């Protein structure tokens, strides 16, 4: 590895998904203001709003958005602009 280009503070960090309280330990250079103790070891704690354990794409619990009503409303208001008068 090339010397002098890699971060010095690459260490184990805990990421906590705040939507479902899941935690996972990985290596990161992110700075943390809080710490958490897991199995007797203190780690820096990074809180995230969403992760792979709660994101609909990864969980398969996709939320369907009903846009058909919006399209119908638009078409009734403005009609088909491509029609020749």
From Swiss-Prot:
The keyword Ribosomal protein applies. It comes from the Bacteria. The keyword Cell cycle does not apply. Pfam families: Ribosomal_L31. GO terms for cellular component: ribonucleoprotein complex; ribosome. InterPro entries: Ribosomal_bL28/bL31-like_sf, Ribosomal_bL31, Ribosomal_bL31_B, Ribosomal_bL31_sf. PROSITE patterns: RIBOSOMAL_L31. GO terms for molecular function: structural constituent of ribosome. GO terms for biological process: translation. Keywords: Ribonucleoprotein, Ribosomal protein. Part of the 50S ribosomal subunit. NCBIfam families: L31 (TIGR00105), PRK01678.1 (NF002462). Belongs to the bacterial ribosomal protein bL31 family. Type B subfamily. This is Large ribosomal subunit protein bL31B. It comes from Porphyromonas gingivalis (strain ATCC BAA-308 / W83).
């Amino acid at each position: 590895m090339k010397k002098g280009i890699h971060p010095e503070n690459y260490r184990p960090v805990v990421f906590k998904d705040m939507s479902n309280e899941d935690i996972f330990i990985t290596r990161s250079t992110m700075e943390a203001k809080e710490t958490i103790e897991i199995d007797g070891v203190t780690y820096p704690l990074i809180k995230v709003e969403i992760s792979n354990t709660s994101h609909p794409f990864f969980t398969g619990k996709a939320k369907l958005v009903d846009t058909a009503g919006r399209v119908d409303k638009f078409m009734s208001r403005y009609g088909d602009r491509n029609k020749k008068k």
